[in-house]
Each structure stands twice: as structure tokens, then as C-alpha cells.
A protein has these predicted regions:
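Conserved acidic, metal-coordinating active-site core of Asp-based
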Residues: 1-81, 86-95
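Asp-based, Mg2+/Mn2+-dependent phosphohydrolase catalytic module
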Residues: 71, 99-139
Length: 139
């Protein structure tokens, strides 16, 4: 399990790249076992996450923007930028035309059906900083 499991209330997370290092076949096997037992399961850059229900990042983003900003994200999604790094961001890449992925998305590319519009040259935090710098330059 992931080291932050004690703080999780709505999902289970299995570490595959934060402190442990699982092979791709083992990651797929854990994800498939979760799905076989009725969980929704995705793979992030560090965890294999499983949960009960059909909630996901896009539904959560719609809810959070409506609740805290009193705005309709689906009506103005063209004005938002989403940045991700793994296969579990695919639903956001599908819904967000201004989507960005950091370079380490490359290891998940073959799992995607919906792709980010832009991929940074830098990985992880460096890629995020690259995206922020680009936004600041065009503002």
C-alpha cells in the first residue's frame, strides 16, 4: 500500500513508483485485480488507485469549480488549462482542450486514447514550471 494510506478515506492506493518500483506487468495485474473485484481503477505516475463508484477527476473538477467558484466549468473549459502526468489524467485530456502533460507522460502514452494538446520538454516539477512560465509570457 501507499505510505499515505492512513489518510485515505475514499480509495485504496498501491505504490508502484514512489517508494516501491513495480514492473509494468505487475502494475497492470494489480489494476486488473482491482477491476475484477468491482473497483474503478487507474494508474497514476506513482500509485495504482482503486475506488467504489464512478467518480473521477472531471466530475470532481466540475463539482469543485461549481461549489467554490460558483462557475460552470463545462461552459468555460476553453479558458482553463489542465496539466497532468499519467494515464489517470486521460479523462481531463479528453474534456479540456487546453490540456498539457509533463514529459514523463511518455511512459503512459501507449495506454492513452485521449492525448494532451501539448507536452512539456521537462519532466515532473520542471515541466510544470515550464508550463507556468509559458502562461506568464502570454498573459
Amino acid at each position: 500500500l501507499a505510505t499515505d494510506s492512513a489518510g485515505r478515506e475514499t480509495d485504496i492506493a498501491v505504490d508502484h513508483a514512489e517508494h516501491a518500483h513495480l514492473e509494468a506487468s505487475d502494475i497492470a495485474r494489480v489494476r486488473d485485480i482491482m477491476r475484477h473485484h468491482g473497483l474503478t481503477a487507474t494508474v497514476s505516475s506513482i500509485h495504482i488507485n482503486g475506488w467504489i463508484g464512478d467518480h473521477h477527476k472531471w466530475a470532481g473538477a466540475l463539482w469543485a469549480v461549481r461549489l467554490w467558484l460558483r462557475r460552470d466549468l463545462s461552459a468555460e473549459v476553453d479558458h482553463w488549462v489542465y496539466i497532468g502526468d499519467s494515464a489517470n489524467d486521460e479523462i481531463m485530456f479528453r474534456h479540456c482542450p487546453q490540456s498539457v502533460a509533463v514529459a514523463n507522460i511518455a511512459s503512459h502514452w501507449g495506454q492513452l486514447q485521449h492525448f494532451p494538446r501539448y507536452v512539456t520538454a521537462g519532466q515532473r516539477g520542471i515541466g510544470f514550471a515550464e508550463m507556468v512560465q509559458a502562461l506568464l509570457e502570454i498573459k
